[in-house]
Amino acid sequence: MNQNSDTTHGQALGSTLNHTTEVTRISNSSDHFEDSSSNVDESLDSSNPSSNEKASHTNEEYRSKGNQSYVPSSSNEPSPESSSNSDSSSSDDSSVDRLAGDPFELGENFNLKHYLRAYKDSLQRDDIITRSSGVCMRDHSVYGVGSGYEFLKTFPDIFLQPYRAITEKQVVEKAILSHCHALANAGELVMVLGQPGSGCSTFLRSVTSDTVHYKRVEGTTHYDGIDKADMKKFFPGDLLYSGENDVHFPSLTTAETLDFAAKCRTPNNRPCNLTRQEYVSRERHLIATAFGLTHTFNTKVGNDFVRGVSGGERKRVTISEGFATRPTIACWDNSTRGLDSSTAFEFVNVLRTCANELKMTSFVTAYQASEKIYKLFDRICVLYAGRQIYYGPADKAKQYFLDMGFDCHPRETTPDFLTAISDPKARFPRKGFENRVPRTPDEFEQMWRNSSVYADLMAEMESYDKRWTETTPASSEAPEKDNFGSDISATTKHELYRQSAVAEKSKRVKDTSPYTVTFSQQLWYCLARSWERYINDPAYIGSMAFAFLFQSLIIGSIFYDMKLNTVDVFSRGGVLFFSILFCALQSLSEIANMFSQRPIIAKHRASALYHPAADVISSLIVDLPFRFINISVFSIVLYFLTNLKRTAGGFWTYFLFLFIGATCMSAFFRSLAGIMPNVESASALGGIGVLAIAIYTGYAIPNIDVGWWFRWIAYLDPLQFGFESLMINEFKARQFECSQLIPYGSGYDNYPVANKICPVTSAEPGTDYVDGSTYLYISFNYKTRQLWRNLAIIIGYYAFLVFVNIVASETLNFNDLKGEYLVFRRGHAPDAVKAAVNEGGKPLDLETGQDTQGGDVVKESPDNEEELNKEYEGIEKGHDIFSWRNLNYDIQIKGEHRRLLNGVQGFVVPGKLTALMGESGAGKTTLLNVLAQRVDTGVVTGDMLVNGRGLDSTFQRRTGYVQQQDVHIGESTVREALRFSAALRQPASVPLSEKYEYVESVIKLLEMESYAEAIIGTPGSGLNVEQRKRATIGVELAAKPALLLFLDEPTSGLDSQSAWSIVCFLRKLADAGQAILCTIHQPSAVLFDQFDRLLLLQKGGKTVYFGDIGEHSKTLLNYFESHGAVHCPDDGNPAEYILDVIGAGATATTNRDWHEVWNNSEERKAISAELDKINASFSNSEDKKTLSKEDRSTYAMPLWFQVKMVMTRNFQSYWREPSILMSKLALDIFAGLFIGFTFYNQGLGVQNIQNKLFAVFMATVLAVPLINGLQPKFIELRNVFEVREKPSNIYSWVAFVFSAIIVEIPFNLVFGTLFFLCWFYPIKFYKHIHHPGDKTGYAWLLYMFFQMYFSTFGQAVASACPNAQTASVVNSLLFTFVITFNGVLQPNSNLVGFWHWMHSLTPFTYLIEGLLSDLVHGLPVECKSHEMLTINPPSGQTCGEYMSAFLTNNTAAGNLLNPNATTSCSYCPYQTADQFLERFSMRYTHRWRNLGIFVGYVFFNIFAVLLLFYVFRVMKLRSTWLGKKITGTG
């Protein structure tokens, strides 16, 4: 038996699920765009038709054996159980035969059941203990806080919050789950059913004891006698909660994602002498084969923003990763979402197989589950508003509610029927039972507690408790080590369970540790994962490398070849300041990165894969080589271009402090992200930190000039110590030749150096050089002996910050779990909501805000059918027929030609509801996008016609498109969103009042009156899934689409009742005359009956069927059965049947080409003839419409009206998202005060004038975080425009750009003014200047234009960038570039000749010159004692006599303070601040010119926004259509 092999990787099928808890890994090798060729139909023990038999009697054979694991029979014979399950297909026989050969073969005939039995055989042979567990949860209640409703908080509410916190009644504690029970023996499957908000997710979390985020939890839970506290402490990896959302590192491939989970849970006691690497590889291939993912091994998992595997494949990656962690008890929260019915069945069937063979216990919530899936479960739990109304055998659940008095539709599936019980509008009592059935959750719960099924459950729980909590000593006869039979005692079970877990742990892992591998192994695995994440993201690596190289070349050329003289003394400080600041601040993006991966780390932490500290340390380590390379390139280029101290020691010291400074700041930003609860607060503190770091590094203002109230900040700034050491390294033991001695000019050439001085602070009289060490001490108070002391301090800061990050990662567990709640505008909420918010109200379910007493305070829709029918009569009735023929769609992927649609044809007519179906990846959404003219890449060929004529520019405006993703402006109310659509999409000839009246009709039709004034928001904070879907449909209906309504997966993610409600609504729309084409994923038989026609696609975008469905799908079923398909059972679901027939599913295949069957069928010929007839009838018709000018226009409304509507909506969006405005306001006020009091009350000394220069400079640098704050909102609005509004031609892109620019102006003026006041008056710019009112007004005016400048600059950058992250990088790069040439860091006179043009080109030259020259013009300079230059005159002359010629003939001469002295002449280099500004080429006389030029730059930016938006967002869309070949016949 292999005990060690502690190399790198892991084990098989999750040690086959904890040596009873892991199933399925990965194995395929084709690109994920291709059809999978692996056949896993027979890999699933219930995938054959006969397997339904086994499922129907819910595995009684297994349950009759209690917890006894399967004991394999001879490997050469099929087991009796196998025979009893009637798996009698020939393929099954061949699988059994193959068991005698290589049972671990993962070929095309792979059989999961046989694999697992062979695997258990090998465990027995190697004497490996396995473990399994059941669960008993008794009287469990979960409480949270919140009413389920909130009032919208606008910007002013931030200031009113303290008052309302006092006056408004505090929200009371609410019950999410109330006195629920759960019991599952090892190896059982439990389905949890209920409407959204019933508490299903909370129930699953409770089963896995994942309840730390709730307010309070009551009740007891144990796992075969192991207390939940002990289970979470010692065996947390045995409990899995797999959430609904797919949370992964998007840059990792599928194989890398699964490998990592398997490595971290690889047991030490592996069967068959497998090494860790062999184990991990086998696990990966096994899980992937079971879930049909092998072809995605080398494809990135991706996410909504990173292209990767498809949505259905990503869901399967989530499931596979869960299996790789080897849980004994797994809870799967709506894990079938996004999967087609066949793939969903395959997933649950794998759970069934693992339950049977490995005793893995699973709880599953699933929406729209099929009958076939339902039959695989042992127990059913039904929840109603947090109340448990049934928990018992699956085969008794339906009858329980039938006996209660409810009726079930003949073709309604059992899961749909059970879910409908909790919906008052969907449940139907039988005749005579109307007043006898329960109505409220309390009544249902009470009836359940009085039932015999409840009594049976209590008796079974009592027996379970007695069995697994007894303390009888273990039997003297040792039980089998690979099973926990029903005859063993609780003590023996617990000891064996502990032994099994301990045996899996690597050496040096404590027996009580929850982790499987050592910390060093965890660290190694995390290092490998971090490396893979970097390598798989070449765009990030490339952008960072480019940024470092670009900046080094720019700065190096600006400060090119500095001389060892006093002219470049100031410039050397500028180079060193920029070097360390730039390298350090490149880590600012770490904040966003840390928050993006926080949910992933939390998920892995819950599964005990690794210490979070291992990930913290690994990410810091992996970052080092990339930082080393980037800073190496930066240092080499910049150091030698600028001619810094050219010694080996000087260069390596420079490099060392840049590297350690950047590394320390990376740890600072990471630790900041680790201790903050959300990204907004971390980013705000990060922005403030950047400002403090930049100011207190020591270059902008020497620390000795900072007031005592802020001076301590410098000692918290690691870069201050780094900058000090860089300055010491550069200046120590060096003498800088004086470029010009004072006095100079005619008559002074013959005087010796002894009578002159260098005009530099710290210069000694009578010397022609400046000593570097003295300069540092006099100017900065730097002492050369502190160089290496500073290194130790920075390392100490780094160690402390890493420690903080590690402690935060291990101890802090931020509450990211929020219940769903509606948000209403104040004064517009229903009365019940006002009561719920202001008075505590009724107990509401925090998952959706439903009244836990059974009502729903937001459902007040009228039930008057007659009234609703009148509203349907107002729907625009269509008369046009949309048809397409021979439609092909080709794209290029990595240079390879792919055809996504292949010769598709069909038509949609008014009054008919047409379904578009197919498995995942068949091209449903692609076809919908092509038909709706919404694809922007590739080549489309074929005919798309309206009434036999080609499409015109009005097509998109006259159609509605309901996207699968509900894309909205989250801050709009439902009514506002519909009014916006109606106002801009209905013809201009229709009065606005009439448009709004129609909106009210649509709201009534969709039964949205009760939440019409609710904010759409985001999922969790706003409308729930069904409400958002209704709002999306409403937005399209409000436009009165005269031609066609497209809908993409309108029922995706909805429970069965919500899906039924949506489809019934579509049915009524079609009956009212609307033409509808709708894709649908998992329709039940009843749902499917609502459709008139079907277009069925198979992989490759090939048509399998198009035509009528027929009553009860008879026409459709007859077609397939007449062409050789097996007969569809009378109680079967036709939608599932046709998908099974054509081989849909992740692992399914078919031996027949149904596309070829269709092409050769009479039905296809009939459709072609029908298309010819339709087109001919319209082409021959004399009644051809002549569209008016209004009808022919691309947009329904004029540009001015578009701008008005979009601007109003954007302003509302800003006003209703107070976090954006508050962060902007807080940054302006805080930064203004911070800079103001840092440079507080500057006097008239030379250093004071320079400090004022940097005070102005820092005021302009503030634009960087402000731009970073406005770009995400701009991109958010732009994404809505691009995804939904632009394709529908709602309004012009010009309207979008102008509205985005205009809406920023009032906020910039108000907040900019507040910054100006907080910045201007503490520095006391107004002191000592003439006409302070005029100059203050000028400075304010120029700064207000600067507010407009940076906002339009940021919008221009955002227009060209795909996302906010990229925009932030580009923005920082460009902003740094333009701000570098303004003459502050390097005066224009010192610039290399090549760059002089850039000084004149950058707008910051005119901004800073305008502000500073205005604010210091005419100020007298009063040198302080250390700023005075001491000159010794020749013997016999007074200071005045000696200096008179110099002072008279030189306009730039300073001020001589003691003209009568004969020694030690005190000379101040400047008389006025204007002379100081001349050094930077700044003049007061340019101020109005500067204002005019800067205003010109503002208008240039506006033009740039328009141009870049057109080039990157509009022209791109249009240019791609040039590649399309779409023909028409009209």
Curated annotation (Swiss-Prot):
The keyword Metal-binding does not apply. The keyword Amino-acid biosynthesis does not apply. Its main location: membrane. Residues 1-100, 843-864 are annotated as: Disordered. Residues 153-410, 882-1125 form the ABC transporter domain. Confers hyper-resistance to brefeldin A (BFA), an inhibitor of intracellular protein transport. Could serve as an efflux pump of various antibiotics. This is Brefeldin A resistance protein. It comes from Schizosaccharomyces pombe (strain 972 / ATCC 24843). The lineage of its organism: Eukaryota, Fungi, Dikarya, Ascomycota, Taphrinomycotina.
